Amino acid sequence: MENICGNTNSKVMVIGCFHGDEPQGKYLIEEYLKIKSDTKLLFIPCLNKYGVEHNVRTNKNGVDLNRNFPTKNWVLSKKDNFYGGAEPASEEETKFIMNIVNKNNPTLILTLHAPYKVVNYDGDAKEISERISNIIGYPVEESIGYETPGSFGTWAGIENKIPTITLELDEECNVMELKTPVFKIFELLENI
């Protein structure tokens, strides 16, 4: 896990790299902070440092962090790329992010993922998702299209009532081309 960056008192959080093979979020957050050191946002550039270093979805224990949250729909699953761990919140990264959320009590959370090119939301985040969609040109989807037991979105957005947006970036697009729309999204979040 990397350090928390930006404004540690912010009520808007942005999280990158739940999955190590989706490094776009880490890069975009780091680039944004180079030009906006006085940000109003709280950033966690990389939740899954091991995954990024090894270019794998899971953490060092083979757990998909986005299936490891203590939700009503968490299930013990087979050990594959979507393995949710031996039990909910078994991973240090999951405990870390839960602690930050509980401590900061954010009013909005944005997580950066890839590759689906959609703005997915959990909880009361449709309006802001539509504004993000207008910036990046991706459709807004309430469902990602498949089951996500133990996901962060379910834990934060549905069960804890914190509007949570999962921005699924285009992995085929050069990450440099994503800077302009994603930075505009960060600026939008700075002003809510």
Across the structure, where does each feature detected by a protein language model lie?
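Beta-strand secondary-structure signal
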Residues: 1-2, 42, 166
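Short beta-strand-to-loop junctions in surface cap/lid or active-site-entrance loops
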Residues: 1-10
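Hydrophobic helix-cap positions at the C-terminus of alpha-helices
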Residues: 5, 32-36, 100, 156, ...
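Active-site/substrate-binding loop(s) of hydrolase catalytic cores
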Residues: 9-15, 21-145, 152, 162
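Active-site-adjacent mobile loop/cap segments within catalytic or ligand-binding domains
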Residues: 121, 147-192
